Amino acid sequence: MENSDDIRLIVKIAQLYYEQDMTQAQIARELGIYRTTISRLLKRGREQGIVTIAINYDYNENLWLEQQLKQKFGLKEAVVASSDGLLEEEQLSAMGQHGALLVDRLLEPGDIIGFSWGRAVRSLVENLPQRSQSRQVICVPIIGGPSGKLESRYHVNTLTYGAAARLKAESHLADFPALLDNPLIRNGIMQSQHFKTISSYWDSLDVALVGIGSPAIRDGANWHAFYGSEESDDLNARHVAGDICSRFYDINGGLVDTNMSEKTLSIEMAKLRQARYSIGIAMGEEKYSGILGALHGRYINCLVTNRETAELLLK
């Protein structure tokens, strides 16, 4: 420990620096000592407990959860919205607000942004800030349309166009379905100029915003209602844990080849992995397996979720 004179000097310097907001250069001039000495004594004051710094975590009660998610799953970003005492729609809205702030912070001029479909992605898009000037970004769908199996407000084209309107961005829409009747039709569409234009953006995607599917979903977006009983039974038999853009994987993140694989028009998971930011937005116990599989497969490197789901993932 320092002698009493050193301690008094450290306290004096700390008081000037932290309480009176003086710069280290100003303190050095006032006390007649080198600036490097000021820096060294401030550091020593923290190390010896003379100076303590407290962060008020009430302003972000979920910060610890975010840090743990990043560490456990190697994420670039994790955002956890509060869920205590909130109805499901309120939780979804809060998650969308937090996700929109994240996207707004991460976007760079010239970025290509890809969108999937669904409620969670819609919540994020609706909360994107309305820009008065162009962000010079391009918004594109990364999956075909759901062929009337989703409400129009959740359609990938609705979300892509809506985001572009808010960001003052260029947009391209998908004039093809996500799931075809057979591989021959799919292959024919893939030869069209329209599909080639859309899919060319997938090769250089900067940011992806994706919802996450799961076999436990019980509402109108469940796999049985969306893909039909035969395909749904096939997914269950193959122990599928989740999907992104109708690309299926198991709980360990391994891709699962299904009866639909050769009939699907959406971004390949390898290309999704290459995006600078692949942002998954999902919440709820029923989405747990889908989120966990996506994290294990590293199909997303950013996660936006709620507190309850974050705690499940960290168990």
From Swiss-Prot:
InterPro entries: ArsR-like_HTH, Homeodomain-like_sf, NagB/RpiA_transferase-like, RNA_pol_sigma70_r4, SorC_transcr_regulators, Sugar-bd_dom_put. One of its GO terms (molecular function) is carbohydrate binding. CDD domains: HTH_ARSR. One of its GO terms (biological process) is DNA-templated transcription initiation. Signal peptide: none annotated. Residues 24-43 bind DNA. Keywords: Activator, DNA-binding, Repressor, Transcription, Transcription regulation. Pfam families: Sigma70_r4, Sugar-bind. Belongs to the SorC transcriptional regulatory family. Positively regulates, in the presence of L-sorbose, and negatively regulates, in the absence of L-sorbose, the transcription of the sor operon. PANTHER family: TRANSCRIPTIONAL REGULATOR LSRR, TRANSCRIPTIONAL REGULATOR-RELATED. This is Sorbitol operon regulator. It comes from Klebsiella pneumoniae. The lineage of its organism: Bacteria, Pseudomonadati, Pseudomonadota, Gammaproteobacteria, Enterobacterales. The gene is sorC.
